[in-house]
């Protein structure tokens, strides 16, 4: 896997491009502050959050909003209070907002307010650049319209909400140049409405969303087939942008980019983070927007033109998803316990997934923004010229290339405060290329593939879009 490499301004100015490329393998490959975060997530905190969320009985989007002890309203109030408590502990560093919209639809037959609970930690250097982590607060049973029966939703998706609350706690006392957003969404099971609420809010506020890390079903390590795996996590990412125009698609068909959307390169970034800091957790990149025929709250972000990925456990147990609480009595399922209860959560595994998210957000928030205006030239030549626009906060840049069938970046060359480089004897036809920006203290951005297919700049959203089904 590609690793996150560190270099200093002194190295940039004192060492030639060629020498830097040769010495890349000897450059320190981690940051001490990130190394400390790797083991920081607390299983006790995660368990306490899920226990509390389960105690509200059901968190169905159409459940009670006025009770203090049951329903989605009580759950929202508790999450809001938890964020506010974390903010008090860091001297008011977090702002809590509750954007909402009213929807009707196939799974919302009457007008229903869908409210998100969002914690915002402003960046000190680049506050309009935003890194988002999401999970959904609502839960359901077998009948998606049943808002009365108990629906504990311990793994789907109290696990994701617990992870983002813990990430907010850990990062509340860390420095961040970009803004960090931690959002407990509602309305996911009824049609991804909470994701749309937050994506619309981001657009209205003019946020430059670098990514949404959507964590949904991240706490179970035992699959329905008996497979046990607490050492890997799936990261789903789209290959081409959801709102790609016909003109952009035509250009891509000639120049490539089918597997290099910003979301895909964000997945590669997360894999690199895990490889560097979490030797006991492997990122399994999945070349899909979501699981087959299913969806999640990352989809509204993609539809709005923002990069986004979905983080999900490696082996799901469908007896614990979207199920009434019951014990099987038929010949096929006698004795099987159905329902998404807390005993199905592996808290050590959830802590490792939480660490992956926390590290990714910390690294992204300290790195410069990804380069813009990346282009390549080299038709009818044996060398390739890579160009880009400089970004604020970058001390240097790194050019990457890989075989067109390779899943990860294979080669790299570090350059100083430049806006182009000529790769000698690297034929443009045979490789995919990208550029990342690097700060003076060694934090690196995701890699940007050339042109519209790989740009992290928000794509124009289509005039109208419809949400994918709930997962």
Residue ranges of each PLM-predicted region?
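A non-catalytic alpha/beta surface segment that caps or lines the substrate-entry region
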Residues: 45-122
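Extracellular fibronectin type III
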Residues: 438-470
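Metal-dependent peptidase/peptidase-like ectodomains
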Residues: 185-296, 304, 308
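Alpha-helical metal-binding/catalytic segments enriched in His/Glu/Asp
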Residues: 119, 133, 137-139, 143-192, ...
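Conserved aromatic anchor
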Residues: 382-394
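N-terminal capping segment at the start of a domain
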Residues: 23-70, 320, 330-334, 338-340
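Beta-strand-rich modules
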Residues: 423-444
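Active-site-adjacent mobile loop/cap segments within catalytic or ligand-binding domains
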Residues: 54, 218-236, 285-366
């Amino acid at each position: 896997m590609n690793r996150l490499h560190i270099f200093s301004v002194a190295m940039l100015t004192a060492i030639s491009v060629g020498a830097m490329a040769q010495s890349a393998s000897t450059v320190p490959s981690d940051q001490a502050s990130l190394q400390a975060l790797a083991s920081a997530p607390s299983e006790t905190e995660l368990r306490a959050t899920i226990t509390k969320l389960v105690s509200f009985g059901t968190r169905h989007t159409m459940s009670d909003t006025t009770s203090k002890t049951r329903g989605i309203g009580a759950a929202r109030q508790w999450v809001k209070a938890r964020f506010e408590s974390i903010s008090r502990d860091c001297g008011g560093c977090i702002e809590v907002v509750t954007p909402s919209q009213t929807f009707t639809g196939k799974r919302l037959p009457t007008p229903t307010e869908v409210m998100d609970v969002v914690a915002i930690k402003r960046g000190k250097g680049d506050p309009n650049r935003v890194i988002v982590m999401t999970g959904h607060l609502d839960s359901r049973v077998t009948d998606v319209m049943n808002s009365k029966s108990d629906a504990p939703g311990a793994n789907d998706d109290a696990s994701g909400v617990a992870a983002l609350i813990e990430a907010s706690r850990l990062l509340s006392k860390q420095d961040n140049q970009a803004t960090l957003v931690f959002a407990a969404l509602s309305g996911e099971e009824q049609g991804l409405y909470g994701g749309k609420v937050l994506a619309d809010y981001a657009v209205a506020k003019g946020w430059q969303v670098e990514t949404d890390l959507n964590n949904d079903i991240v706490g179970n390590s035992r699959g329905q087939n008996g497979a046990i795996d607490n050492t890997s996590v799936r990261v789903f990412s789209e290959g081409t942008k959801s709102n790609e125009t016909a003109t952009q698609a035509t250009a891509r068909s000639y120049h490539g980019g089918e597997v290099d959307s910003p979301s895909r390169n964000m997945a590669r970034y997360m894999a690199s983070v895990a490889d560097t800091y979490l030797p006991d957790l492997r990122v399994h990149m999945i070349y899909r927007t979501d699981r087959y025929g299913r969806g999640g709250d990352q989809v509204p972000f993609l539809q709005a033109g923002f990069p986004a990925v979905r983080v999900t456990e490696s082996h799901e147990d469908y007896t614990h998803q979207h199920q009434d609480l019951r014990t099987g009595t038929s010949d096929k399922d006698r004795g099987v316990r159905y329902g998404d209860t807390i005993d199905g959560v592996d808290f050590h595994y959830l802590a490792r997934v939480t660490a992956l998210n926390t590290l990714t957000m910390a690294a992204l928030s300290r790195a410069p923004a990804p380069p813009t205006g990346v282009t390549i030239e080299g038709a009818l030549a044996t060398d390739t010229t890579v160009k880009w626009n400089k970004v604020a906060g970058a001390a240097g840049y790194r050019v990457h290339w890989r075989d067109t069938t390779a899943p990860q970046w294979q080669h790299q060359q570090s350059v100083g405060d430049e806006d182009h480089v000529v790769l000698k004897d690297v034929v443009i036809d045979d490789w995919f290329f990208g550029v990342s920006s690097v700060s003076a203290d060694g934090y690196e951005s995701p890699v940007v593939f050339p042109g519209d297919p790989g740009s992290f700049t928000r794509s124009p959203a289509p005039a109208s879009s419809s949400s994918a089904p709930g997962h």
